[in-house]
Amino acid sequence: KVVGAAVYKDTENVLPLFAMQAALGGVAFCASQEKTALILTGGEISAEWLLEQVSQIQRKAGQFVVFDLKNVIAELPIENRANCFDATVAAYLLNPLKSDYMYEDVAREQLGLMIDEKADGRTKACYEAYTAFAAKEPLENRLKDTKSWELFENIEMPLVFTLYEMEQNG
């Protein structure tokens, strides 16, 4: 089963300059065309509990699809590297001349979906999780059609983890 996921950062009480340092506010998930859920931290849901749940979902998913996996690894526990699919890397391989690979672009290019730029962060996290889920199959099919699947699977995906580890170790 394919699971799309996205990190929601709680940036409401943080200056824009420090938005990347904001605390984990929640995680959005999508595993069907009909439903996307955002689980927020706060109240009875601690960040630690949420991360445990994410770990279980990630480990058991057939494919765990996110945008910008290298940055997601810093926020979410990734125990099963073999089932990860980085939609950003896939989009890059399909169009290496672009300067950025935002989920909004993938939504438009792969799904014909326009994302409301004025949506709040919570809504955007849900859109990102949905786009990760829904775009996985078309991205994979296009990678196979362009003979880039083996490059993606055998070189690019393992490299994401290597680059993350290099950044962590200095």
Predicted regions and their residues:
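Mixed-charge, glycine-rich, non-catalytic linkers/tails in nucleic-acid processing enzymes
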Residues: 78-79, 106, 118-170
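Conserved RNase H-like, two-metal-ion catalytic cores of nucleic-acid enzymes
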Residues: 1-110
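A basic/glycine-biased coupling hinge at the interface between accessory DNA-binding modules
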Residues: 111-114, 118
